[in-house]
Every structure is written in structure tokens, then in C-alpha cells.
């Protein structure tokens, strides 16, 4: 329903509520030319609700993110613009998180939004913004970060079950 992040270090999992922070939000809003007070935390941009909200801000039409994905696949210019905005925001945020947490082991994306996004993502745009604004040494680090998508649904439940079985 939003944006969460966890860091795995050894046998420890550190969960965060990164989506409810405004870390980097001002820079994203400026880059994406979002001039609305409706975007106050990261998940107001980087989530299914965020995609819908950006579409509504741009067009005046309230549409679910799933339909925006479909419209994008069918060549709708407004939907493509919003998916590109999401792609840029997602790439920049993952890049910053990768550097903040030294994601040498890579990034695993989970959730239906990540799975749906993978099918329509402009990978060149993502890669450009994943590295954009970074120094050469940091680009070198980021180029080594693998990004994968967990294609299995309900991954959070499997994680919870694994935790319960360990206590």
C-alpha cells in the first residue's frame, strides 16, 4: 500500500518506514515539476497511490495505478508521462538508499507495484536516473548493485512466517 524498505545485515532485518519520511522529497518534487501540496512524504510519489495522485494532478482525472499502467501500454501520453515521472523518482530514491545502506548485496523489490512496473519500465530512463548526479566513484559502486524483483506474491507473509518459525 506504500513504500517500505528493509535492510538485511547478517541475520538481522532492520525494517524502516522510509515511505513516511520526506528524505529527498523536495528534490524529487523539483525535478518532476510537482507543484502540489498533496505530496508530503516519499510514498505520496513512490507508490500506486502516488502514481494515481500524479496522474490526477496532471490531468484532473482520478484513475487507479493499474489502469494508468494499462493506459501507458496503450500509448496514452499522460499515462506515459506519469510512469516516466515514477521511474525517475523510483530510480533516484533507490540510488540514494543504495548508497546510504551500502547495498553491496543488491536490492530486492517486492510487491505488486514492483512486479507490474517491471513489465512497463523504461529501463534506459531508470538506469540514467539511478546514476544521475553521482560522482564517478559512486557510479562505480552503483553499477555493482544488482536489482531484482521478487515475482512471488505475499512476500511479506513469507517473511513473517519465517520469523515466527525462528522464535
Positions of predicted regions on the chain:
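ATP-binding/phosphotransfer module of carbohydrate and carboxylate kinases, centering on a glycine-rich
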Residues: 31-167
Amino acid at each position: 500500500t506504500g513504500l517500505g524498505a528493509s535492510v538485511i545485515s547478517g541475520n538481522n532485518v532492520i525494517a524502516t518506514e522510509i515511505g513516511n519520511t520526506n528524505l529527498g522529497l523536495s528534490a524529487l518534487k523539483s525535478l518532476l515539476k510537482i507543484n502540489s501540496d498533496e505530496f508530503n512524504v516519499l510514498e505520496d510519489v513512490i507508490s500506486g497511490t502516488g502514481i494515481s495522485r500524479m496522474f490526477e494532478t496532471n490531468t484532473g482525472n482520478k484513475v487507479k495505478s493499474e489502469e494508468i499502467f494499462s493506459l501507458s501500454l496503450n500509448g496514452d501520453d499522460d499515462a506515459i508521462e506519469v510512469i516516466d515521472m515514477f521511474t525517475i523518482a523510483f530510480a533516484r530514491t533507490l540510488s540514494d538508499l543504495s548508497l546510504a545502506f551500502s547495498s553491496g548485496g543488491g536490492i530486492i523489490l517486492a510487491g505488486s507495484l514492483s512486479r507490474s512496473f517491471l513489465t512497463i519500465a523504461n529501463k534506459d530512463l531508470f538506469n540514467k536516473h539511478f546514476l544521475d548526479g553521482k560522482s564517478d566513484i559512486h557510479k562505480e559502486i552503483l553499477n555493482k548493485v544488482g536489482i531484482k524483483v521478487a515475482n512471488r506474491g505475499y512476500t511479506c507473509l513469507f517473511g513473517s512466517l519465517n520469523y515466527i518459525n525462528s522464535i
